Amino acid sequence: MGQKINPLGFRLGTTQSHHSLWFSQPKNYSEGLQEDKKIRDCIKNYVQKNMRTSSGIEGIARIEIQKRIDLIQVIIFMGFPKLLIESRPRGIEELQMTLQKEFNCVNRKLNIAVTRIAKPYGNPNILAEFIAGQLKNRVSFRKAMKKAIELTEQADTKGIQIQIAGRIDGKEIARVEWIREGRVPLQTIRAKIDYCSYTVRTIYGILGIKIWIFLDEE
């Protein structure tokens, strides 16, 4: 049987780049890694609390962290930054203060920037959040998948594959359902493929959502 490799790790250095850019001594590496995880969790929790959207989409595509000796630069790529800025005009400053308190940055400055991504529904994380919201509202999974595919078609993507696994529609036996539209060449390294794996808690249990989006070929 074919071995499934993570499409992002498989393409690192060709079409994908790292989301954390910093160097450290081997003995301090694990601390740096934990710090990154905490920063990302803290930002996601803050956005979840302060962003009131009807669809329940946080809209965070990815969070990039660049570290220097005296500075931590955090860039948040969002699909709908307007919603965060409108609900909290001083939201970014508040978030910066919260993070500085949390990490006790005495000798390091922390800087947060928010960047809008051009086509939000061409991003698998935002799409997975959309599907998760639909499944929580007990929309049938096929309907949710089809709606997600319609949204990506508007974002000019070349192909998409969506997979949902678990107790779908509350059935007794867990199963895997998937749908593909267009081309998704997972074996081609020069193909720019974005991928995300997302878990959603429904009343019947946990469902896993995986999304592969074929953006372009280099």
UniProtKB/Swiss-Prot annotation:
Protein name: Small ribosomal subunit protein uS3c
Gene Ontology biological-process annotations: translation
Pfam families in alphabetical order: Ribosomal_S3_C
Cited PANTHER family: 30S/40S RIBOSOMAL PROTEIN S3, SMALL RIBOSOMAL SUBUNIT PROTEIN US3C
SUPFAM superfamilies in UniProt: Prokaryotic type KH domain (KH-domain type II), Ribosomal protein S3 C-terminal domain
Lineage: Eukaryota, Viridiplantae, Streptophyta, Embryophyta, Tracheophyta
Family: Belongs to the universal ribosomal protein uS3 family.
UniProt GO molecular function: rRNA binding; structural constituent of ribosome
Domain of life assignment: Eukaryota
Gene3D superfamilies: 3.30.300.20, Ribosomal protein S3, C-terminal domain (3.30.1140.32)
Keyword list, A-Z: Chloroplast, Plastid, Ribonucleoprotein, Ribosomal protein, RNA-binding, rRNA-binding
Organism of origin: Solanum lycopersicum
